[in-house]
Amino acid sequence: MNRRILSTVEELDSILRELDSVAETSDDELRRLFMTFSMEYPVNAEKDPYSHEYKTAQSALYERLSGKPYTPANEESAFDVGEAVFQPFPYLTKSPRTVGNHIIAVGNVIRHIQSPPPSTILEFGPGWGNTTLMLARMGYQVTAVDIEKRFIELIQKRAAQKSVEIECIHGDFSFISDTSRKWDTILFFECFHHCFEHQELISWLDGVVNEGGQVIFAAEPITDLFPVPWGFRLDGESLRAIRKFGWCELGFQEGYFRDLLHRHGWSVKRTDFTDTPVGTVFTATRLSDQNSGRTPTSLEGSEASRSKCQ
């Protein structure tokens, strides 16, 4: 498939107008068209991913693409809560492929949770609440934190439908920066890449995870194929999300991601599951917990280890 390399936001706007009309009729066709265009990274990018200059350059790139400065308040999603109660994503797409891939991915995430119910789970960015509801129905004590009020309202209504309890908190990733609470599992499922201040977020994790606990990063764009250590993704789908909605759409090189976690005392294991395009899971456990034998689960391993679920 030939891919068009865009160089201006005017070119991007022209394509997005075409995509808007396609989105009204076919989710599958929309996703296919995402693969037909992208942008390229500047060749003279700042090299140190922990430097102020690097972060400033990424902020400037975002402003160029979105037309405004980034703030977590940009992460809003407009939808009808009443309709979504009965037909949330992925069902609203009416795409067998999209629905199937999502359901498989959710199941893959759940089987990586090492502590059985009624242990505690903090889920960031639960969105439509599909994983949240499944965990609550299993008997987990789930805390769901989302910056979008409509998602919080949706999860509350869906929980009431199933007669399950879910603690819903309207907030952003900084919620864990000043809480005294701890959880057995922290879950990021397709949401960690929405955190521009991700280095700060990683520094907070140690204070909110119980001994022997874990942090799960599922279906996140973490790959050494990414052209820079971390930054805004410039593929078609990400460009649309940044330009049209103002969302933060980061990508990460795996080496950088592992180094960042290791700097804060975490070991990382990668598990690939190829039956869905969003099947890769990174599980972080404390180095100190591993050394003391406090992580009894078959899914764990050394920092550099990788495995495949069959």
Regions found by a protein language model. Name each.
Residues L187:
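A conserved beta-strand element that flanks and buttresses the S-adenosyl-L-methionine
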Residues A218-T274:
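C-terminal alpha-helical "lid/dimerization" subdomain adjacent to the S-adenosyl-L-methionine
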Residues P118-G127:
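Conserved class I S-adenosyl-L-methionine
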Residues W128-F175:
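Class I SAM-dependent methyltransferase SAM/SAH-binding core
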Residues E190-C191:
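Short catalytic micro-motifs in class I SAM-dependent methyltransferases
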Residues R97-P117:
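Conserved alpha-helix/loop element of class I SAM-dependent methyltransferases that forms part
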